[in-house]
Regions:
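Alpha-helical scaffold segments that mediate packing/assembly in large oligomeric complexes
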Residues: 1-45, 156-162
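Sequence/fold signature of self-assembling virion shell proteins
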Residues: 72-162
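Charged, gly/pro-rich, cysteine-poor intrinsically disordered low-complexity regions
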Residues: 29, 33-106
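Long, contiguous amphipathic alpha-helices that act as assembly "spine/axial" helices in icosahedral shell
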Residues: 1-23, 48-59, 63, 92, ...
Length: 162
């Protein structure tokens, strides 16, 4: 999850990069309480590139989703920007890996991932026996790549002044 949704390159044992890393510098500015129009404008920006949008999904933190659930879609209707885990007809996926004040949008058919080669699963009851713990280690070769960069967009929410 961290590789797919982070806006910074994950370091360590991988060279994989998710779709939002290259979008940080060109992120669309959203207000502290993003409006329905702001969400729809970002959606239109992705759809205008020719992406059909059948697999579009919003990515944000639970805190950002809570703000959208409390933001009215328009004055007086009582309808909120995020209702039933959807914004502008698209599902909302929450993860802290996207980072606070970031909202991602992507058509995930253009971010394939797979496991390659042999998979080894090691059960190690000895290394941490003094701690009464058993280590479970799964070793796999994992890969992912962004097929169409235009299928993804990133918005940066302006933090509310205190």
């Amino acid at each position: 999850n961290k590789i797919l949704f982070s806006t910074t390159k994950v370091t360590g044992a991988t060279t994989l990069v998710g779709p939002f890393v290259g979008l940080v510098a060109s992120a669309t500015a959203f207000s502290a309480e993003p409006t329905f129009k702001e969400f729809n404008t970002l959606k239109a920006k992705v759809l205008a590139t020719g992406v059909d949008g059948d697999n579009l999904c919003w990515v944000m933190t639970k805190a950002q989703k809570a703000i959208a659930e409390a933001t009215p879609k328009d004055a007086g209707s009582g309808i909120m920007v995020c209702e039933n885990d959807h914004i502008a007809g698209l599902p909302v996926f929450t993860t802290n890996y996207i980072g606070e004040n970031n909202i991602g949008l992507g058509d995930w058919r253009y971010q394939p991932m797979g496991l390659f080669g042999d998979m080894s699963f090691v059960i190690d009851p000895y290394s941490q026996a003094r701690k009464d713990a058993v280590d479970f280690v799964l070793n796999v070769n994992y890969g992912t790549t962004t097929l169409r960069k235009e299928a993804f967009a990133l918005a940066k929410v302006t933090p509310a002044s205190k």
